[in-house]
């Protein structure tokens, strides 16, 4: 029968003839182990990928709890709970991140490839600021640490107003125990007699000592005076001290109000000394501030003077057009060089400055005439117009001075007569010698000009005197000249008009002949100066 059954089974279904055998455990282990690539996102940035192998606990597939258990083994317990996990899966034509929980099944991204991503979790209470849980854990650890004395001094300042009488000490200590953290509360509330404290921890008794000063009597350092300092020294500053012992052998007996008063009085001497030191250190030294202000004013004045001196300390070379800073006080040698160069030296507040006179292109000259210097002509026109003896002075006589007038001012009272020298240049002597014959021939035909020559010779002596002396003798000279030379008011106006017109039109004196005078001079510095001026002839 058995042989027939075997033959029948082989003919009917060959698969039924196979014996069912269970697979070996090694085969099951190979199937349960899966390779996973995961990313960690910190500060919103993905790190480099990590690789690990996870055993599948369920025949349905890989669950997230299997991955979390493997991470706790590899990276430490609690590491996986700090992240939210998501898996990469195909969606339509691309890939998406599928958020997962612990009981969710992880789908492979491609075949047997699993890709996971862990993102940092954010706290719900601080979701607006996006603070991660890792930072919250460190903040909780910092809260356990003892608060600094600066933060506690703010709490004590609010309750220091209740220290006016003896009852306020118990009330203040009770408030501090409520405001202080548990670590400090256990230390401060534990009662120990002051004698035992001094015996055990005399060195560590005043380690955490701090003081709270009342704001009364204190003033700003900038508004302190001698009166306020003396008044504040009479009224003592009320202080409150708190001592925190660092010994670990402190017993847990309750501290009474009397013990508080004794413990506060133990450090009163030190507090008073420190209060006096702090009181004295508030007021700044007034002498230093005054001296510093004086130094600032000195520097400002020196800067202003330096700017003013720079404005008037430039020498102008007419040939090369180069500006060079000159010495503010000229010596005798420098003054001679100025006279040689036919320049005008104007004296203002004992500071010398060179004013160009023979080039009208400079705008700072008061009177841009090629024949007269501004410092001489503008001051002497009034005197010439008032004195009839000087009204007949020829313009060609004044052209030889060419701005070489030196006006000096002396501040000393002894030197009352500060004479100004009016020198004629070398060109005048040469022209006078050449024209001496022509003047002698025309002397008979023109008696008016011969009369005016002595007055022109006296011009240098009259103008060389000091200005107040000329103003005082102005009437006397006018009376003497009117006796010698009669002149009416009409002629006076006509003469003044002739002088003003001659200043505006210097070419209208001589229309017949003109001559060119050239002066070549070399200064000590090596610069060569050439002066060319057109001079009309002496004939009218």
Curated annotation (Swiss-Prot):
It is found in: Cell membrane. A motif (Association to cell membranes) lies at residues 342-343. It holds the Pfam family SOK. Residues 221-244, 418-437 have a biased composition (Polar residues). Its main location: membrane. One of its GO terms (biological process) is specification of plant organ axis polarity. It comes from the Eukaryota. GO terms for cellular component: basal plasma membrane. Belongs to the SOSEKI family. 'Soseki' means cornerstone in Japanese. Homodimer. Forms long polymer filaments with other SOKs proteins polymers (e.g. SOK1, SOK2, SOK3 and SOK4) crucial for polar localization and biological activity. Binds to ANGUSTIFOLIA (AN). PANTHER family: PROTEIN SOSEKI 3, UPSTREAM OF FLC PROTEIN (DUF966). This is Protein SOSEKI 3. It comes from Arabidopsis thaliana (Mouse-ear cress). The gene is SOK3.
